[in-house]
């Protein structure tokens, strides 16, 4: 022990190294973006981070493939629904607007060394539009925020 002649100083320095604030400085801080798809009738996902924030995007204004029998068994990841949403649903412009909001937020959170951002997409059943949007945002963030 380097400070044996100063036991109190040794104790203080030892306790300082155990402080949470210093542990946070030692580890590399990375931002985790949690992306959810949900059905409004089941409720908006809770933010368990303790920050109580994030974005909730309402996809119900987009054309709903769920109202057509031929799409009911599919999700927003299945090709027939993807084609419908991209060709008739207005989803590309919608997501471009989402990206314009989320991208600067992600950049700023990284700069400020924040560790959590939650983004949720909701629609009527949580199966088609919100699933498509959640998947595309999840694919977009790493590509646009290296």
Residue ranges, per PLM feature:
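C-terminal accessory "lid"/substrate-recognition subdomains
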Residues: 2-117
């Amino acid at each position: 022990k380097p400070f044996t002649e100063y036991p109190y100083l040794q104790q203080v320095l030892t306790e300082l190294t155990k402080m949470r604030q210093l542990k946070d400085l030692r580890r590399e801080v990375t931002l985790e973006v949690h992306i959810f798809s949900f059905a409004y009738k089941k409720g908006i996902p809770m933010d368990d981070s303790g920050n109580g924030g994030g974005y909730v995007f309402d996809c119900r204004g987009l054309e709903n493939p769920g109202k057509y029998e031929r799409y009911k068994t599919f999700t927003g990841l299945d090709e027939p629904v993807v084609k419908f949403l991209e060709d008739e649903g207005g989803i590309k412009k919608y997501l471009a607007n989402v990206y314009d909001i989320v991208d600067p937020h992600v950049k700023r959170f990284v700069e400020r060394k924040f560790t959590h951002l939650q983004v949720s997409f909701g629609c009527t059943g949580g199966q088609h539009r919100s699933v498509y949007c959640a998947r595309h945002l999840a694919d977009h963030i790493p590509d646009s925020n290296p």
